[in-house]
Amino acid sequence: MKNYLNESLSAQERAEALVNEMTVEEAASQLRYDAPAVERLGIPAYNWWNEGIHGLARSGVATMFPQAIGLAAMFDTDLVFKVADITSTEARAKYNEYSKRDDRDIYKGLTLWAPNINIFRDPRWGRGHETYGEDPYLTAECGKAYVKGLQGSGKVLKTAACAKHFAVHSGPEAVRHEFNAEVNWKDLEETYLYAFEELVKKAKVEGVMGAYNRVNGEPSCASEFLMGKLDKWGFDGYFVSDCWAIRDFHEHHMVTSSPVESAAMALKAGCNVNCGCTYVHLLSALDKGLVTEDEIRASCVALMRTRIRLGMFDKSTEYDNIPYSVVSCPEHKAVSYQCAVKSMVLLKNKGILPLDKKSISTIAVIGPNADSRAALEGNYNGTADRYVTFLEGIEDAFEGRVLYAEGCHLYKDRVSGLAQAGDRYAEAEAAAANSDVVILCVGLDATIEGEEGDTGNEFSSGDKNDLRLPESQRELIKRVAKIGKPMIVVCAAGSSINIEHDCDALIHAWYPGSEGGKAIADIIFGKVSPSGKLPVTFYNSADKLPCFTDYAMSDRTYRYTRDNILYPFGYGLTYGDVVVTSLSYDDGKVNVEVENNGADTCDVIELYIKSHCDNAPVYPVLCGFKRIFVKKGEKLDVEIEVPDKAFTTVSDIGERKQFAKEFTLYVGTHQPDELSCQLSGTNCMSIEIER
């Protein structure tokens, strides 16, 4: 038996044995994302590129969950874990079938390039909805849960997760191939590297993807500083470049002068897999003396180690018998529905919700996102075998008459190319006039907030120019509101949106997945209570934001600003009335009693800490949370552990340690700011502690 087939040896030993049998040409070929077969050694071809940030993506039918920003809005890491576990189950089911048929194409492997744990620091960033929001702690908690769900706890990895994009990456999309993110040591440690360190140390993430941009002058995929951080944290997985990022070294960053030099620079820094085609020049780099054979083989060992950890060279694994029938099965769709319900955020309710079906005979469902599948999907999405749009969900749940009108194009001034501008406004006005209540479904989709290079992008390479709806939708809202009927606005978007016009209720639905229509209907009609919380700050205007290209955290996110706020981070209403009635702290644990004076509801108890020292963030920061269910009139005891790291802060030179001795802890259903208290009608409790 060849040593690389000997399952009693470690993955490292087996990988070294396998690579020792390769020629240098064969080893170099394995560093491409589309690695060819090495038939004489029995190594099948393997494509490293697969996606799965909210369900398996781009590989045909799969369960479609809410976009990642919606998963963060649940404030429920157990459910985030379950989403990832289902995603990896479906990935294995597909891999088992595809491998039998020798189909080893892109999006069919076991290395999932997820999660995206970049910090959504600026609401204009088009890819922000792929992330878990603006807070490092929440991002890390969701990210760790997702990694553990993807990788499993078996003898071999169920799938291999990949933390991306390392690091300091959050727009602007239009300049990402040439941009240099300049960031100080404090912001690096406190904000941009926090989640990556947590995923490496505590979740043992198998992969890390480098970003397109430079960080303080160094290309992220060849950064001595960033690679040094991974070594310090004990990372022993594989490192992959973002797709065609190494080409940027010589075409945009101008740190090398040729593809050969770029390939050499990336390899020597520690980039194992090139998503792109620059590593076809590695043998030329070897001939020129720019890299060594040992460096090529070392990278190949890292990659074979991951494949061995996935069980690819074992006789069998515990996942081989996962059947194809699990893909998009009813049980998985039920979890998608549960996520959609828990992710949606009720931002405003003037007493209209939940709607009483018995008092209404006709509902008008209006808007470009009312019957839109794209409004459910986000990006990096799979294909659902059944979509329930907002319109379909409301029609299924309501026995009376539903009048539908598209109202307007998502962003163009007309729906029909042959018509005059505003060609669908009259229909929307008529539907509103002939109804008892209006449900107006507006927002965005991935064509107007997304990634640079996506074929469907219409504006600003995926970024948003401002925080308002497109003009076509603003005019629609104004016209429908003039009719004077009660109006509920449902906004499908992955980021901060200022609706501007008044309404009777406002629900931010994110991109809620294939079950989004059922979820919105059940919330509107009161079958369930909304309970999502904002994982990002909603701002009034983009005009008052710092410069998009400025990566300093001052005046950004809830930790550093209280200006220009429309709806605060952590805010979200329910149909209940959950209040904290007592608070105590002992031995690293916070104990609270909560009471619900309203309807049965889920809610989130949020814990914030303020360190009393000069280098602490300006405002209290999230350091714990727990999702609860409380019946009407019920009291509940809740315990939240305060992590040791919560008592540390970061100095101006990037040193993290406990500087303060005195702290204030705040507990409530939102953060302890005046606006959250005003909007929710409840206060937080606080306690002073020493440590």
Protein language model annotation of sequence segments:
Residues 675-691:
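Short beta-strand elements
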Residues 1-673, 690-691:
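Glycoside hydrolase catalytic-domain context in secreted enzymes
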